[in-house]
């Protein structure tokens, strides 16, 4: 059954904010403990991919999710326009170079999906090359999972109205001026075109499923993503390493 992004809410009116935020904080504490165990075990890794339009809240949810995590085992990579050197390689070269090591929790703010998304809308790469990238990405993500890297993919589903409000804040609030880019407003004019490509990505690169996150409100977005990440970590075979010592015996 084809997934249609517009069938998914950007905001859930029935959620109680105070209760939701309390549940979220409890989940974040559990995520922190499990992430530390994963780092100590040094066997598995977790890759969290965050995609969404400009001002959908990818940076903010990253900050919230890692509140109680051990920073030593955390890596964050934000994908920008490819450099000249990156353009000289295949499109996955720059991605494979920064996937998580064993034990790490890695967050991709944007990802390899930008190499389908942007050229599809802006039309600077032939369609047949873009079509091939769908298969290559599916294969790449299977490779990661086959090597003990669990992959979670989130699409930050923000309404056009909420996006405009956040972009306006970057103009009006001094502490957010640094986030402003004129190009974000150019991209906004193609909001529906980008959404259509995202829909194709979600339906085609779906061997590892996508999670469509209601993102108009930061507290709802954080709850939704934390719940899935916690469930994933709980289902991984995470164990504290045994004591290695010739002098001491392991405690209970």
Predicted regions and their residues:
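Charged, amphipathic alpha-helical linker segments immediately N-terminal to NTP-binding catalytic cores
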Residues: 1-26
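Conserved nucleotide-sensing/catalytic segment adjacent to the nucleotide-binding pocket
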Residues: 14-22, 72-132
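Pre-Walker A adenine-sensing motif
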Residues: 30-40
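Phosphate-binding beta-loop-alpha motif at adenosine-nucleotide cofactor sites
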Residues: 48-51, 149-162, 181-186, 205-224
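Glycine-rich phosphate-binding P-loop
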Residues: 50-66
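Switch/connector loops and helix/strand junctions flanking conserved nucleotide-binding motifs
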Residues: 58, 85-88, 114-120, 160-167, ...
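A glycine- and Lys/Arg-enriched "phosphate-lid" helix/loop adjacent to the NTP-binding pocket
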Residues: 120-136, 144-196, 243-248
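NTP-dependent small-molecule kinase module
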Residues: 194-252
């Amino acid at each position: 059954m084809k997934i249609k992004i517009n069938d998914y809410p950007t905001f859930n009116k029935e959620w109680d904010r105070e209760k939701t935020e309390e549940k979220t904080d409890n989940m974040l504490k559990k995520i922190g403990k499990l992430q530390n165990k994963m780092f100590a075990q040094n066997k598995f890794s977790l890759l969290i991919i965050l995609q969404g339009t400009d001002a959908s809240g990818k940076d903010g949810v990253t900050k919230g999710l890692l509140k109680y995590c051990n920073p030593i085992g955390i890596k964050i990579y934000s994908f920008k326009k490819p450099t000249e050197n990156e353009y000289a390689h295949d499109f996955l070269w720059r991605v494979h170079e920064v996937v998580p090591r064993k034990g790490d929790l890695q967050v991709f703010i944007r990802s390899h999906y930008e190499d389908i998304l942007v050229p599809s809308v802006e039309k600077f790469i032939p369609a047949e090359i873009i079509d091939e990238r769908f298969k290559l990405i599916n294969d790449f993500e299977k490779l990661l999972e086959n090597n003990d890297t669990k992959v979670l993919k989130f699409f930050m589903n923000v309404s056009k109205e909420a996006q405009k409000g956040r972009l306006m804040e970057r103009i009006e609030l001094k502490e957010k001026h640094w986030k402003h880019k004129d190009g974000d407003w150019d991209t906004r004019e193609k909001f529906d075109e980008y959404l259509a490509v995202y829909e194709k990505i979600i339906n085609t690169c779906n061997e590892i499923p996508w999670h469509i996150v209601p993102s108009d409100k930061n507290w709802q977005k954080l709850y939704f993503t934390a719940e899935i990440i916690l469930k994933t970590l709980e289902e991984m075979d995470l164990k504290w390493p045994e004591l290695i010592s010739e002098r001491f015996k392991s405690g209970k």
